[in-house]
Curated annotation (Swiss-Prot):
Keywords: Ribonucleoprotein, Ribosomal protein, RNA-binding, rRNA-binding
Name by which UniProt lists this protein: Large ribosomal subunit protein uL2
Lineage: Archaea, Thermoproteota, Thermoprotei, Sulfolobales, Sulfolobaceae
Assembly mode: Part of the 50S ribosomal subunit. Forms a bridge to the 30S subunit in the 70S ribosome.
Pfam families hit by this protein: Ribosomal_L2, Ribosomal_L2_C
Extent of the signal sequence: none
Key word Ribonucleoprotein present: yes
GO biological process: cytoplasmic translation
Record's compositionally biased regions (Polar residues): 206-216
Family: Belongs to the universal ribosomal protein uL2 family.
NCBIfam families in UniProt: PRK09612.1
Gene: rpl2
GO cellular component, one term: cytosolic large ribosomal subunit
């Protein structure tokens, strides 16, 4: 008999399983403006769902935007935005102006996309070369990526790099960590459930108690375990 499984509930798309976008303070991206402008960091805040702190920057033309705060950035710091900005920590530059070896973050692929690469806490990319109208950058994954020389990037390293090393210490901290993401936590094992909740549930002890292999054509409520497995268990030694 089919069961209403966790993945079936998630596939329905109820708010329980969706990312709570209504908690975000705004879109973290560069504004689509041209020219060279001077701005000021008016605040550094936390954006629910992000590990990296977010800087609120106000430009001289009145435009406000959110961007990843970089290491060493402080409130009331002056930054420069756009083509012709010097290579200084916190400035938003056209990546084509950056010499080889420059450390950048929040890098666009093309002008106007708002930033695509090296955006998470503690990450950065390195300018490694130029080829025609493209700039080659080395991503945190060590992959070399070609981006437009008109694309914008922030000089420096995204702040908050030690967040993954900070111990959670208690389950409540982990609860709030996942509460603002599109992830369900905790995940309960099927063998720990009641028989009405999962095909592996029930019994006086935690065991699948039946073959865990299941057909590729099984209905969704029964399609758990080793799906269309050619074999299970350890390989026999020669």
């Amino acid at each position: 008999m089919g069961k209403n499984l966790l993945q079936q509930r998630a596939g329905k798309g109820s708010p329980t399983f969706r990312s709570p976008s209504w908690l975000r303070i705004g879109k973290v991206r560069y504004p689509n403006i041209f020219g060279h402008l001077v701005g000021k960091v008016i605040d550094i805040v936390h954006n629910p769902g992000m590990n990296a702190p977010v800087a609120i920057i106000k430009l001289e033309n009145g435009t406000k935007f959110l961007t990843q705060a970089i290491q060493g950035l402080v409130i009331n710091q002056k930054i420069e935005f756009g083509k012709g900005s010097p290579i200084a920590n916190g400035n938003v530059i056209e990546i084509g102006d950056a010499p080889e070896g420059t450390i950048v973050c929040n890098v666009e692929e093309n002008f106007g996309d708002g930033g695509k690469y090296a955006r998470s806490a503690g990450s950065y990319a390195v300018v490694v070369g130029k080829s025609g109208d493209k700039v080659l950058i080395k991503l945190p994954s060590d992959k070399i990526k070609a981006v437009s020389n008109k694309a914008r990037a922030t000089v420096g390293v995204v702040a908050g790099g030690g967040v993954v090393e900070k111990p959670l210490l208690k389950a409540g901290a982990n609860y709030w960590k996942y509460k603002v993401k599109a992830k369900k936590w905790p995940i309960v094992r099927g063998v720990a459930m009641n028989v009405v909740d999962h095909p592996h549930g029930g019994g006086l002890h935690q065991s699948v108690s039946r073959p865990s292999t299941v057909s590729r054509n099984a209905p969704p409520g029964r399609k758990v375990g080793h799906i269309a497995a050619r074999r299970t268990g350890r390989k026999e030694g020669k």
